[in-house]
């Protein structure tokens, strides 16, 4: 049979998706984290894979879904949090922009699955299914009550789930996980479609969202989930030593306040007394596209006058960051390869060919 007749849409999808195959899975498995360091990889949106010097693997907010895929329905879902926020009716054109860099069904070595809150782009049924099917039968699922309710509803056994609220500490091998206050006001207006928010006191944040501080033997990582800027970042900075801080950054559309701005990112880094501040989430949605270099421009303008003790780092999805080896770098570039050039004789017509 000719190729053009045997190839189908399904065969095309299976041969190209996920775009990175198991490349990053293999890289993470092979990584030997040196003493006094920790390594992490950006999985897209606020998804992070963290690996400690003891070989402990945890993932946070790993999401494998997508955004809008059709113009079929021109209207936003009734009661959507963005509709509540801005009084809009039109469909939000939020298309997923980055590739899928990690295959959840190729995960074999993992010690905990975490989520910061229950928004669709921060918790994933495919990840839960893959871990349940292919990994050790004691891997815990850790998150606030709303996340645990989702996991249990998907079929994760209740005894595998750990509900956390601010102040709780969970130890996973050599990583100490501190659940801290979250500041995600959008989460508080994420309600059933028939429930009104106007004139009603919101319920508590603690059941819906948490921030995390991961304390490893080689340093600490602060994961802010979808939190907006809050004065309470300074309280967290007073109470904990924070080496690297991750903040949800984006270019908010007109009438919307859902992501931190470049100024907010700098304020967060300063308030937390962090050493490095890294924006994330700006990659995922086409309508929140932002230029993270703006953060560095503002940092350059203010750092000497305000005596900043931190540096910004501009990352790429699928890239690795190692603390403290990368603490003085400003921007990530994917490995360029060809470091072994001229280890064998080139095969060219003559030396000056290229």
Swiss-Prot record:
Cofactor(s) recorded in Swiss-Prot or TrEMBL:
a divalent metal cation
Location comes to: Cytoplasm
SUPFAM superfamilies in alphabetical order: Metallo-hydrolase/oxidoreductase
Q: In which pathway does it act?
A: Cofactor degradation; L-ascorbate degradation; D-xylulose 5-phosphate from L-ascorbate: step 1/4
Do you know what upregulates this one? Answer: Induced by L-ascorbate. Repressed by UlaR.
Which Pfam families does its entry note?
A: Lactamase_B_2
This entry's Gene Ontology molecular function terms read: L-ascorbate 6-phosphate lactonase activity; manganese ion binding
Q: Which Gene3D superfamilies match?
A: Ribonuclease Z/Hydroxyacylglutathione hydrolase-like
Reactions catalysed according to its record: L-ascorbate 6-phosphate + H2O = 3-dehydro-L-gulonate 6-phosphate
Q: Which domain of life is it from?
A: Bacteria
Q: Which GO terms are recorded in the biological process aspect for this UniProt protein? A: L-ascorbic acid catabolic process
Q: Which UniProt keywords apply?
A: Cytoplasm, Hydrolase
Gene Ontology CC: one annotated term: cytoplasm
| Keyword Ribosomal protein among record annotations | no
Q: What is its EC number?
A: 3.1.1.-
UniProt lists the family membership as follows:
Belongs to the UlaG family.
Entry's PANTHER family? L-ASCORBATE-6-PHOSPHATE LACTONASE ULAG-RELATED, UPF0173 METAL-DEPENDENT HYDROLASE MJ1163-RELATED
Q: What does this protein do?
A: Probably catalyzes the hydrolysis of L-ascorbate-6-P into 3-keto-L-gulonate-6-P. Is essential for L-ascorbate utilization under anaerobic conditions.
Give the NCBIfam families listed for this entry. Answer: PRK11709.1
Name of the molecule in the record: Probable L-ascorbate-6-phosphate lactonase UlaG
Organism name: Shigella boydii serotype 4 (strain Sb227)
């Amino acid at each position: 049979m000719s190729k053009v007749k045997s190839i189908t849409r399904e065969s095309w999808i299976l041969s190209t998706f996920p775009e990175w195959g198991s490349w990053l899975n293999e890289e993470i498995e092979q990584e030997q984290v040196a003493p006094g360091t920790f390594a992490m990889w950006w999985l897209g949106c606020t998804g992070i894979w963290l690996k400690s010097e003891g070989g402990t693997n945890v993932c946070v907010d790993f999401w494998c879904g997508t955004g809008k895929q059709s113009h079929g329905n021109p209207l936003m879902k009734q009661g959507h949090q963005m509709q509540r926020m801005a009084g809009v009716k039109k469909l939000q054109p939020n298309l997923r922009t980055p590739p899928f860099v990690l295959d959840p069904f190729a995960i074999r070595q993992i010690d905990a699955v975490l989520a910061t809150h229950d928004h669709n782009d921060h918790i994933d049924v495919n990840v839960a299914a893959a871990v349940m099917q292919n990994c050790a039968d004691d891997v815990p699922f850790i998150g606030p009550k709303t996340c645990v309710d989702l996991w249990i509803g998907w079929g994760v056994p209740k005894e595998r789930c750990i509900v956390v609220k601010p102040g709780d500490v969970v130890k996973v091998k050599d990583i100490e996980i501190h659940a801290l206050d979250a500041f995600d006001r959008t989460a508080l207006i994420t309600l059933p479609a028939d429930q009104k928010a106007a004139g009603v006191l919101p319920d508590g944040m603690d059941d819906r969202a948490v921030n995390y501080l991961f304390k490893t033997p080689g340093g600490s990582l602060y994961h802010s989930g979808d939190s907006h800027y809050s004065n309470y970042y300074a309280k967290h900075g007073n109470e904990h030593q924070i080496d690297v801080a991750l903040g949800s950054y984006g270019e908010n559309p007109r009438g919307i306040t859902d992501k931190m701005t470049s100024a907010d990112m700098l304020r967060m880094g300063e308030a937390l007394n962090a050493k490095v501040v890294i924006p994330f989430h700006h990659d995922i949605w086409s309508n929140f596209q932002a230029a993270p270099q703006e953060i560095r421009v503002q940092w350059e303008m203010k750092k000497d006058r305000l005596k900043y003790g931190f540096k910004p780092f501009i990352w790429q999805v699928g890239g690795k960051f190692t603390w403290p080896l990368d603490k003085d770098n400003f921007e990530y570039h994917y490995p360029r390869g060809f470091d072994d050039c001229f280890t064998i004789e080139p095969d060219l017509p003559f030396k000056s060919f290229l």
